[in-house]
């Protein structure tokens, strides 16, 4: 299954050899760019409440182990992080520099993907390349440009990360000979499986945080009975309209079928019009196509901007009680996320079914640190990433999440980040956003557009058939 997933993601938009042909990328590239640019801007807006002042990031609750001594040795790192993210990364790796005497040289660029591939193919790679998604990392491994981190690191991650096996799989790719190795060390995660709400409204109405999907549906029904509207949902996003619906689908798939089926769905070994996928779509429809459930009625979902949707939590009276969206959405709140610091907004885990026996699945993303040029100091740096202290150093600065079960949760900069960190550490399954792993014509094309049609009243079977037809057309 892992190998099939790699073959699928090789067709992704981030495969650099396709960058040169803009006609191939077309609207798919622009639509995905629209989505990612908006997200990046909102993450920047969230820093105001997601970070704190710090005296010394290296003063962490956990003690840093012996990292060895590498005075004067240089480790080159390439990535896409800029601005505050770059500053926080450099603050964090300074702890490794102080402990070992090594020197980190980081080069960040918005054109990271094109630059790192050019450097690797010209035999001038960095020691470490930080990939924001697994597709391009898998391609570089298949071309022989990456060096395995090692089975010992994979075993460590399996034992010490929440949903450790999932993270190992995410960083495991085939080499030039088709043999699987562990290449990608996940460090710094993003979480999508969240439901936002107003603590004041929940308290005033006597509502409790649901622990299961059954309870979430019961809570939604109770809200309707009380004269309240449970959900704000919007899928409009310009050229990227529909992507929020795909996130709903992905979260529901993880709660209604196995992780193995999710992987088969990503690679289309499980057809889009299979019963498992149609069931997930219909459950999403239970939330999004129910006039009693949605602020503005079901017909408003397709035309409501995803950025405007959560604002209903803060109107007086509120037009909805809950909004499912990833952590970045706070940047779209009326006060750009200051509501969280004031206690006016909070989030809880999008829960699993009690009856499904599928554990605690989480949908999200994560950056992958890979080795492209070996050295003893570089090997030591990957050991550093295993240290709880390396995670706590960034946790203290803010806007950082980790699945490291040994990291001290008290190091998180805010209570909300701490709560999200607990969700990741307690996860039993983690999966990357499926639409980002599918070929661009599907994940940023038919999946988006057909889910928009679903929001406009198209039935689930037709929607699923149309997406499967798009898959068949590119095989």
Where are these regions (language model features)?
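Extracytoplasmic/periplasmic solute-binding protein
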Residues: 174-187, 193, 217-270
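Single conserved hydrophobic/aromatic residue that forms the stacking wall/gate
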Residues: 1-11
